């Protein structure tokens, strides 16, 4: 059976898994990510792969998801949370292991997982959205990524007669900015949603604005791309019991669901990408 070595590289940990064609995880290893030094970062990724995989028979590719902008040849411009730039990850791993290596942004990788494995794989088109410290997203059609330079979080939006980047207002951290603009001081998104749940008058007003901003953005993308489903994930979904039904009611033309792959999305999506691109 063919297999892919899947990597999920984050600012804290690097996860490596051996995944077969049925998207079953056969082996997995987690090591701390080395930050601040490019050479040591690359060496640590290679070391983690070697520690995790002792038998390369059947392996057709290495594939990785990373939290940064990636050129289509696997060159990473920067990993802000890892504090390294100009990273030739694909080239480095191909030389190390003599296997083709494919690298994409972690949001795109997670989108592939949702579009190919689990309950939403029956949809022809899926728009993946993650709302945490920022806003990320990707569109899949027939289980494959639609390549685009469109960065969803950098969509411009108007608020109080000023123009802002969408993620600067609607993300988890953006909620603090949105609240501050209305005279509400909060430490984080959790505190904000607690206030909403307790019907704090000012928090409810900000909440109404946030729901409208997010729903307008989803409706705009529904009109532009007509996906069969929007799959949402990210830190704000920890408060889904408070806002999710309100958001769905505010988006009558969109089919909005919660992502299903959870913590495995990065590894499963990387495996999908590897199998799709391996010759």
Residue ranges and their predicted role:
Residues 14-18, 135-140:
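Short beta-strand scaffold segments in enzyme catalytic cores
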Residues 23-27, 144-150:
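Beta-strand initiation motifs
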Residues 1-61, 70-73, 91-99, 113-127, ...:
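ATP-binding/phosphotransfer module of carbohydrate and carboxylate kinases, centering on a glycine-rich
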Residues 110-116, 136-139:
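Adenylate-forming
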Residues 101-105:
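General beta-strand structural signal in soluble alpha/beta enzymes
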């Amino acid at each position: 059976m063919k297999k892919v070595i899947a990597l999920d590289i984050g600012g804290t940990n690097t996860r490596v898994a051996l995944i077969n064609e049925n998207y079953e995880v056969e082996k997995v290893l987690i090591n701390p990510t080395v930050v601040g030094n490019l050479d040591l970062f690359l060496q640590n990724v290679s070391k983690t792969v070697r520690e995790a995989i002792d038998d390369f028979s059947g392996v057709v590719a290495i594939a990785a998801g990373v939290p940064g902008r990636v050129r289509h040849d696997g060159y990473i411009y920067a990993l802000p949370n890892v504090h390294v730039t100009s990273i030739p990850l694909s080239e480095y791993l191909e030389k190390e292991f003599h296997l083709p290596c494919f690298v994409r942004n972690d949001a795109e990788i997670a989108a592939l997982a949702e579009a190919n494995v689990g309950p939403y794989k029956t949809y022809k088109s899926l728009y993946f959205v993650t709302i945490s410290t920022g806003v990320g997203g990707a569109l899949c059609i027939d289980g494959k990524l639609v390549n685009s330079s469109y960065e969803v979080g950098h969509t411009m939006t108007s608020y109080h007669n000023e123009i802002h980047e969408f993620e600067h207002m609607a993300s988890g951290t953006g909620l603090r900015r949105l609240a501050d603009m209305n005279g509400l001081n909060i430490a984080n998104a959790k505190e904000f949603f607690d206030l909403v749940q307790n019907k704090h008058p000012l928090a409810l007003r900000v909440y109404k604005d946030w729901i409208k901003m997010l729903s307008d953005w989803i409706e705009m993308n529904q009109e532009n791309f007509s996906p069969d489903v929007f799959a949402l994930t990210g830190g704000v979904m920890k408060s889904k019991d408070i806002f999710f039904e309100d958001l769905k009611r505010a988006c009558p033309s969109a089919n909005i669901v919660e992502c299903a792959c959870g913590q495995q999305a990065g590894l499963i999506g990387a495996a999908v990408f590897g199998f799709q691109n391996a010759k």
